[in-house]
A protein has these predicted regions:
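PLP-dependent amino-acid enzyme catalytic core
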Residues: 1-267
């Protein structure tokens, strides 16, 4: 992450001008009628699973890659991921006609490898863990001049995810609370920095899994920390350490952070 941190106004500009809709779609809000009736409230679900890669991760990846210079585009991009970020980078590269290399651990299931290849990514299998794959992606980036696309701790990635906040406010004027899952913090940071500038009375609440509550630990320590253990039960948010910039924004703009158990996730 660059030492020059965009201010709130710059994030607002980045979100409003984001080109993510060249590849992503405006996803609907689905009313959860049974839950709404049970709680006596209006509860809606943002259907990011309807994106081409079945995840919001496409937004941040595309926003980052679309902003690269012609020289950077010519050399290509690289990312380390065994999940949704991998597919987001692969599809973004294919859409923009940019070579996208995805480094994945050798333990990655074939179904995930095949999904990245179908999206147009060039898969490199390396190491037995994400950390080893990430180290290899950094080595290859330095060796070949590829641009490394971070999964969350990057202003352009954060702004891409923040387009969800823009859609939420445009789609439902009755919103009083927005609950956002937290892994590395990119989605929560982007949504919160947008919503709190335009409608500060809307509460934005981060939600963490009990086995990977890196934001709660960071808030207690006053800075991001490495978790000793990370549960893979909710593998999409299983992050050992959140980003510096995502922490800064979450600390400043989230109204609250709650931790949910595995049973509550399944409920």
């Amino acid at each position: 992450m660059s030492s020059t941190q965009p201010d709130a106004g710059e994030y607002l500009r980045k979100i409003l001008l984001s080109p993510v809709y060249e590849v992503a779609k405006v996803t609907p809000l689905q009313v959860l009628k049974k839950i709404s009736d049970r709680l006596g409230n209006h509860v809606v679900l943002k259907r990011e699973d309807l994106q081409p890669v079945h995840s919001f991760k496409l937004r941040g990846a595309y926003n980052k890659i679309a902003g690269l210079s012609e020289e950077q585009r010519a050399k290509g991009v690289i990312a380390a991921s065994a999940g949704n970020h991998a597919q987001g980078v692969a599809l973004s590269g294919a859409k923009l006609n940019i070579k996208a290399i995805i480094v994945m651990p050798t333990t990655t299931p074939d179904i995930k490898i095949d999904a990245v290849r179908r999206m147009g990514g060039n898969v490199v299998l390396f190491g037995n863990s994400f950390d080893e794959a990430y180290a290899e992606s950094r080595r290859l980036a330095e060796l070949h001049g590829y641009t490394l696309i971070p999964p969350f701790d990057d202003a352009d990635v954060i702004a891409g995810q923040g387009t969800i906040g823009r859609e939420l406010l445009e789609q439902d004027t009755r919103l009083t609370h927005v609950f956002v899952q937290v892994g590395g913090g990119g989605l929560a940071a982007g949504v919160a920095v947008y919503i709190k500038q335009l409608l500060p009375n809307v509460k934005v609440i981060g939600v963490e899994a009990e086995g990977s509550a890196c934001l709660v630990e960071a808030l207690q320590a006053g800075q991001p920390v490495n978790l000793e253990r990370v549960s893979l039960f909710a593998d999409g948010v299983a992050v050992k350490r959140m980003g510096d910039e995502t922490f800064r924004l979450c600390q400043q703009y989230l109204d609250e952070v709650i931790v949910v158990s595995n049973d509550e996730i399944c409920a």
